Amino acid sequence: MHKNWLILFSLFFFAVNVFAAPKKYNVLFIISDDLTSTALSCYGNTVCKTPNIDALAARGTRFTRTYCQGTYCGPSRASFMSGYYPHATGVLGYKSPRPKIGNRSTWSQHFKNNGYHTARVSKIYHMGVPGGIEQGGHGADDAASWTERFNSQGPEWKAPGNTLSLIHI
């Protein structure tokens, strides 16, 4: 009798492990303009106090060896989000990589296509000030990448003076 229970018990645990859904990890990605790792206390800054970021870093994965593909945010972000170098995305200014990468997935789109809820707050694909973003609209975003988009209402500003883009050189 005990042998039958032991076999039944073993089969039950085998079945649970075989048919259990694979564990999905929670993924939180934070990106910020002009924020270097040296500005966060989890990377050793003793002046700035960032306890919430520190707590996330202590419980998750903290990257310590990353490289920037562009010298300013448009090409760098497009490269990071798509996995392609700026010259391959054609993003050398502030525009979306989508026209150049076509139907190839961004990493956020890959998460979305695999059952994750992907959300972003404010702009990710820096395309100047996307139309409607100041009123809380979606702007000119990459809709295929997000389940939910939220833009805080508020104006962006530009520093006074003239600028020169590499595109016009």
Go through each PLM region and give its residues.
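Cleavable N-terminal signal peptides
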Residues: 7-8, 18
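Formylglycine-dependent sulfatase
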Residues: 2-3, 19-167
